[in-house]
């Protein structure tokens, strides 16, 4: 099982990533052990996530989400069926 996620950073930017352990990855991002991009943009809020059966599928979906425009990502976040978070 793997997850694709979008984080909303403190400065309003969006970060897209994938992981096999969503709760652990979110904690790592918020502790400054995540990606270089998110380290200086804490705190981070999990705005959107999807579950995929394999890491390969999650990576492909991540690549597709990264190509979206900001407005398209915000629309996806607004329609989030997983609003309750992790």
Can you name each region flagged by the protein language model?
Residues 1-86:
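GIY-YIG nuclease catalytic motif and its immediate N-terminal context
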């Amino acid at each position: 099982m793997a997850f694709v996620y979008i984080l909303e950073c403190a400065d309003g930017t969006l970060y897209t990533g994938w992981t096999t352990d969503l709760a652990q990855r979110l904690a790592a991002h918020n502790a400054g052990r995540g990606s270089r991009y998110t380290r200086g943009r804490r705190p981070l809020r999990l705005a959107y996530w999807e579950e995929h059966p394999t890491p390969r599928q999650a990576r492909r979906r991540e690549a597709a989400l990264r190509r979206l425009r900001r407005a398209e990502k915000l629309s996806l976040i607004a329609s989030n069926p997983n609003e309750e978070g992790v």
